[in-house]
A protein has these predicted regions:
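A polyanion-binding, active-site-adjacent surface
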Residues: 5, 9-200, 208-214, 238-239, ...
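Active-site-adjacent alpha-helix immediately C-terminal to a catalytic or transition-state-stabilizing loop
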Residues: 206-228
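Long, compositionally biased interface segments
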Residues: 228, 237-238
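Active-site glycine-centered loops adjacent to acidic/histidine catalytic or metal-binding residues
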Residues: 232
Length: 282
């Protein structure tokens, strides 16, 4: 990423001269590491460490693959330790099989992506706002099959971040005011976004929404192309998902679910999709 872009986006000064990590720099290390012996973030070998600031560590993961032809980008917070280990094992297997780097990196990135209840929930949520019609496909379910070329999956903090040795959940510290996390967003996510400027961006959860708006204010993204307000598809979010999809009545919601906020989010999403030429479903 050029220094002019970094300066324009507001890269924290102490990180301005750093060169982002690339797979080629880590391929030999990945091939030689015994990942079975790594059982926690604290045991990740030191050469994978990208940055450390107080309680925060960021480590390299082979998620360099970017689907520049994607029309929709699904954005999480940060890969967790389990995803780091699975991706490393997939990359190691690809290296030993002699796969081309592009093929290897794609396999590493999508190993186990959106498994379990998350996938059908995500499909239902995306279809409910009309994304499948904007993409001119029957259902967003095909984004995990025949239409996979239309979707890119990433995280606003692409490299795994751990706080006090645990997966970072976006709550503390605040990624929008923490220099190391700001730098991680600009080093990696911003570079990906610049390669896919015309896609629609789907933030998974409110913390990611705030981060994407922070990036939009810096010129990394177009705010009009961010679909804020879609509930996180996790099974733990079942009640919010059910109400968003019209499967649960408002008067039956628990005190933990703000039905009025979900109503407002749905209206805003409908207006945003209408501006993109997609009328709300009848």
């Amino acid at each position: 990423m050029c220094q002019r872009a970094m300066a324009q986006w507001g890269m924290p000064a102490q990180f301005a001269d750093r060169i982002p990590a690339r797979f080629a720099d880590y391929a030999g290390l990945i091939g030689a590491t015994d990942f079975a012996a790594i059982d926690s973030p604290a045991t990740i070998p030191a050469p994978f460490l990208l940055a450390r600031e107080g309680r925060i560590d960021a480590h390299y993961i082979p998620f360099d693959y970017v689907n520049a032809g994607a029309r929709v980008v699904v954005v999480g917070i940060s890969p967790g330790f389990a995803q780091w280990k699975n991706a490393m094992r997939a990359a190691q297997q690809g290296l030993r099989a002699g796969l081309p780097s592009a093929e290897l990196l794609r396999a590493a990135k999508y190993t186990g992506a959106f498994s379990g209840a998350i996938r059908p929930n995500l499909v239902a949520l995306l279809d409910s706002v009309g994304l499948q019609r904007w993409l001119a496909i029957a259902s967003c379910a095909t984004l995990f099959g025949t239409d996979a070329h239309l979707m890119h999956v990433t995280a606003v903090l692409r490299q795994p971040v751990f706080v006090d040795g645990k997966n970072y959940n976006g709550a503390s510290p605040n990624m929008l005011t923490t220099p190391l996390l700001q730098a991680q967003m600009l080093d990696y996510f911003a570079a990906e976004a610049s390669a896919i400027p015309d896609a629609l961006y789907v933030p998974l959860g409110p913390k990611v929404s705030l981060a994407l708006s922070w990036l939009a204010r810096r010129g990394v993204l177009d705010e009009a192309r961010i679909l804020h307000g879609i509930p996180h598809p996790s099974g733990a979010n079942a009640e919010r998902i059910a109400y968003f999809l019209g499967r649960k009545d408002k008067h039956t919601l628990s005190s933990r679910t703000n039905g009025s906020q979900i109503d407002a989010d749905r209206r805003a999403l409908g207006e945003k999709m209408a501006a993109l030429g997609i009328a709300p479903p009848r």
